[in-house]
């Protein structure tokens, strides 16, 4: 509480007092503080889970930071099933960061230095891929975050490119990827972390 009270006094604005008073929620207690942690063994020591999400059926899906696969863990049995993603740029680093689901529960990933947007259809257990156009598919291209959450509205999936601070928009109907580089003429380096 003392730290929160102090931080609430820090004001670098032109007004002498914040317009929004500090109103912290009460600390949780009782049942809200009971937590059970369960650890699961993965099939190889080299697996580096980055993001983990639960689907509506209770399976835990993870992106693998250092390898070209995603994994599905059944928390009831501990069984892990891996799905191999082919390389699209042999010789470039592999792996994934963000793992997100669309409204249908299908999984989307940015295949980092492979410069590919990846969709995994959970029911069919099949991948679809969209590789960046040649002019953006440079050595530094790095697709980390893919955002399909509103793709059911307009058929568009957004992605960010950490390699050159770009934003991509995939049109699912045509497969065309549009690119914006808002910091292309900036004098200092910039980055776009997420969309």
Task: Specify the residue positions occupied by each region the protein language model found.
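Periplasmic c-type cytochrome electron-transfer domains
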Residues: 1-12, 23
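A short helix->beta-strand "capping" segment at the edge of beta-propeller domains
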Residues: 24-46
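A short beta-strand motif characteristic of beta-propeller blades
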Residues: 38-42, 79-89, 126-139, 176-185
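Beta-rich, blade/repeat-based domains predominating
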Residues: 45-57, 88-104, 135-155, 185-195
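Conserved beta-propeller blade signature
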Residues: 59-62, 106-109, 156-159
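Short loop/turn segments immediately following the C-termini of beta-strands
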Residues: 65, 112, 122, 162-163, ...
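A short loop-to-beta-strand structural motif that recurs across blades of beta-propeller domains
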Residues: 69-72, 115-119, 165-169
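Short loop/turn segments that connect beta-strands within beta-propeller blades
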Residues: 74-78, 121-125, 171-175
């Amino acid at each position: 509480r003392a730290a929160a009270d102090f931080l609430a006094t820090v004001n670098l604005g032109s007004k002498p007092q914040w317009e929004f008073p500090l109103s912290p929620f009460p600390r949780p207690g009782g049942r809200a503080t009971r937590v059970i942690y369960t650890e699961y063994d993965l099939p190889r020591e080299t697996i580096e889970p980055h993001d983990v999400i639960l689907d509506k059926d209770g399976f835990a899906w993870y992106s693998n930071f250092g390898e070209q696969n995603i994994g599905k863990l059944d928390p009831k049995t501990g069984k892990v099933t891996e799905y191999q993603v082919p390389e699209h740029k042999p010789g470039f680093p592999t792996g994934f960061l963000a793992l997100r689901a669309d409204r249908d529960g299908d999984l989307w990933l940015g295949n980092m230095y492979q410069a590919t947007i990846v969709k995994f259809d959970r029911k069919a257990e099949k991948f679809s891929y969209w590789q960046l156009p040649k002019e953006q598919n440079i050595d530094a291209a790095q697709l980390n975050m893919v955002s399909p959450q509103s793709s059911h509205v307009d058929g568009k999936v957004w992605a960010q490119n950490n390699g050159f601070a770009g934003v991509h928009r995939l049109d699912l109907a045509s497969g065309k990827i549009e690119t914006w580089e808002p910091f292309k003429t900036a004098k200092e380096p910039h980055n776009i972390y997420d969309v």
